[in-house]
A protein has these predicted regions:
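Ligand-binding pockets and gating/stacking loops
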Residues: 1-477
């Protein structure tokens, strides 16, 4: 197992790094970091290095989507389980999905469904931490104690010589209410996401601090950086730890973000033709996915995008309890946006020849209870009916749920695993969060069972102590 045997002397990050903070840190240096083994660790990380630099786009359904109303319908179950929507056939013989997803159905040959995910985290924080960090603890926590896979991959694969950050969160996966559901933990905040907030469909949307449009500004900044580098020359000459080398790299990337026209262009959706923007949908989720595609084309390797907010309905996420709103009304409202955005992303990835390099994963922290709950509305906050109105809902269900995999060179047009006739329990090919994460790491060329990263005390920790890549999702030669 590879380890540099030393820790990063940094504090735990409470959330993603803001754009200004990212650039400020990059330009002021990382004097507090202890990084002598970083470059050796990165060199050892990719024991099965892909032929091309691979990428992952994670579409996160915050709150947990119902598997029965998306990828694992149960038309033969009793009415108290099956819900009001019917299944439809897809272009893949024998594969059915919810009628809410007709666009998915037309491109089912381009994705694989995993219907047998299960874990023990019944709360939003615990479920999210299990899926994103591999933490097996079923109890909720305020913040992660293990780094999420995105931060780890960024730590191991970051190349500061490129003009763009390697990990971008487009409406990032970081929080659920007051809980931090993803973060760098002991890897250190400098490897968190470059965050892009706001609605990319807004005509006034822009990403601040990316690429000066004024060439004179760029030249003045470059002059200042060159002056700073000349003053630092003596320190670099006597440095033996590798720390100054790391500072050079972080400074180079921060400068590149500010001065590179290519960096600015990658985030500029106005450069897309109208028919492509229409393909994804002229709404927040559609344009988030389009931005994700632009970023992987530009070389970004780790992208997360969260589907929540107004397009989910009044609850603003996928947490479809009856006390919040009528689950079926909510799903009927949000499904067209979800269906179009995800299907367009998959189609576009294949149309552009990115399907071998880019893996798309769609999931939430868990599924929803197969047995429909009928509970009186709370009548307040995000509730969709007057207080006392009895309405249907589905609660948290981590014991069996589904996710979607597309691209990544995997064999598509299939289904992995199965749940019972009610969708309550996994009956074949159970997969755990460790398996889920190991599969993502494998696509990124990272041997998760061998690489260690030191924690705050300097003790080496396997980046994934349990789990194995899912064989059915292995890249095809």
């Amino acid at each position: 197992m590879a380890s540099n045997g030393k820790s990063n002397a940094v504090s735990v990050c409470p959330g993603p790094i803001k754009r200004r903070e990212f650039l400020r840190i990059g330009l002021s240096g990382f004097a507090t970091l202890s990084l002598p083994g970083l470059f050796e660790l990165r060199a050892r990380a990719a024991t099965e290095k892909p032929k091309a630099r691979t990428a992952v786009i994670l579409v996160w359904l915050r709150g947990g989507a119902s598997h029965l109303e998306t990828y694992d319908p149960k038309p033969d179950a009793p009415s108290e389980f099956r819900g009001v929507f019917s299944p439809i056939s897809t272009c893949v013989p024998g594969m059915q999905i919810s009628e809410l997803l007709p666009r998915h159905a037309k491109i089912a040959d381009k994705f694989t469904l995993l219907r047998s995910m299960a874990h023990t985290g019944g709360g939003h924080p615990a479920g999210s931490l299990q899926m994103l960090t591999g933490d097996p603890d079923p109890q909720d926590k305020d913040k992660p104690i293990f780094p999420d896979w995105m931060t780890v991959a960024n730590f191991l694969r970051a190349d500061p010589k490129r003009p763009l950050p390697n990990y971008v969160g487009v409406n990032p996966v970081t929080r659920y209410d007051n809980f931090t559901i993803a973060g760098p933990a002991y890897v250190g905040p400098s490897y968190g996401p470059f965050t892009v907030n706001g609605d990319p469909n807004d005509p006034h949307f822009s990403v601040p601090n990316i690429g000066y449009k004024d060439q004179a500004q760029s030249e003045r900044l470059s002059d200042r950086i060159r002056l700073k580098q000349s003053l630092d020359r003596l320190d670099r000459a006597i440095d033996q730890s590798g720390t100054m080398r790391a500072i050079d790299d972080f400074e180079a990337q921060a400068l590149s973000l500010l001065t590179s026209p290519g960096a600015r262009e990658a985030f500029d959706l106005s450069r897309e033709p109208d028919h492509i923007r229409d393909l994804y949908g002229r709404n927040q989720w559609g344009q988030q996915c389009l931005l994700a595609r632009r970023l992987v084309e530009a070389g970004v390797e780790i992208i997360t995008t969260t589907f929540d907010g107004p397009l989910c309905g009044r609850v603003a996420n996928w947490d479809d309890h009856a006390v919040n709103h009528n689950v079926f009304d909510a799903l009927k409202f949000r499904a067209p946006y979800f269906d179009q955005a995800v299907s367009a992303l998959i189609e576009d990835i294949y149309a552009r020849g990115l399907d071998k390099r880019v893996l798309v994963v769609v999931t939430g922290e868990f599924g929803r209870t197969p047995r429909i709950e009928r509970v009186a509305s709370s009548g307040g906050g995000v509730a969709s009916a007057a207080a006392g109105t009895v309405q249907p809902g589905r609660d948290h269900w981590p014991r069996a749920f589904s996710n979607l995999w597309a691209g990544g060179g995997i064999k598509t047009g299939g289904v992995i695993g199965a749940t019972d006739k009610h969708g309550e329990e996994v009956v074949s090919r159970m997969c755990t969060p460790g398996d889920f994460l190991a599969t993502i790491y494998r696509h990124l060329g990272i041997d998760a069972g061998q690489i260690t990263i030191p924690d705050f005390s300097g003790r080496p920790n396997l980046i994934l102590p349990r789990g194995a890549p899912i064989p059915e999702l292995e890249r095809q030669s």
